[in-house]
Amino acid sequence: MRISTLDRRDMKHIHIIDSHTGGEPTRVVVSGFPALGGGTMAERLAVLAREHDRYRAACILEPRGSDVLVGALLCEPVSAGAAAGVIFFNNAGYLGMCGHGTIGLVRTLHHMGRIGPGVHRIETPVGDVEATLHDDLSVSVRNVLAYRHAKDVVVDVPGHGAVTGDVAWGGNWFFLVSDHGQRVAGENVAALAAYASAVRAALERAGVTGRDGAPIDHIELFADDPEYDSRSFVLCPGHAYDRSPCGTGTSAKLACLAADGKLAAGVTWRQASVIGSVFSASYAAAEGGVVPTIRGSAHLSAEATLVIEDDDPFGWGIAS
């Protein structure tokens, strides 16, 4: 058979499995990334960001990805007792932890035949998390320690006036706002995103940060919900909004509720997203904060091989 010149081009191949958790997509990278060494997930993240960031861009940016997509690089764990290691990333950079992404990863590991129902340890750049795959294929994630860093922080937002919120850590840094005057609904996401972007810019101008000067890159707006305990809109880094209720954001919310004495340990909190998907959450008390557990479900959506041709001018993504 005659092979065309096109077929003989040098190509790089990246094997992926896509899923979504409550509408929020996760792209698990199974193979095709460069070796990152045998260090911790935090050390491997640093190598990936410093030396091989174009692979993140190729997977997540257009023409192969989108702003809403979260990547999860599947890694061999450091500890023999862990099921997997993972490095999370999106169109804006890297994430220390991702709740919906961990749920998607665990569902994907089951699809790959690597785990069955039960409790599994997952290594992340910010510490180990415990994930339970239930018989119905839903997943509970016992997250890293969550805590409130600052209460009732006020920033001036042009066009909106003074906005008050809490700064909290749930695996990523959040500014959580309940009194915002916005309608948290799926048909209002453009206005919500514009408002949350303005709040994030105001935080940056005011020098409001998380612990040790860490940037606050997630904005979470809460509203009452007739069926669940709360409905939320989460603006992620890179200006995409979270279709799921956001696992790390829900963890940050639990930390604030616990600090205010509004939710007792072990009591279930039902958090709805802006599109109506739901996580169930509770926490255990811990020194310096709370240890949240988030439960949700992921569904598989694709299994494919991404191809990067050497002569493709957009092979490594279109910068946003």
Curated annotation (Swiss-Prot):
Its EC number is 5.1.1.8. The keyword Isomerase applies. NCBIfam families: PRK13970.1. Belongs to the proline racemase family. This is 4-hydroxyproline 2-epimerase. It is an enzyme of class 5 (isomerase). InterPro entries: Pro_racemase_fam. GO terms for molecular function: 4-hydroxyproline epimerase activity. Disulfide bonds: none annotated.
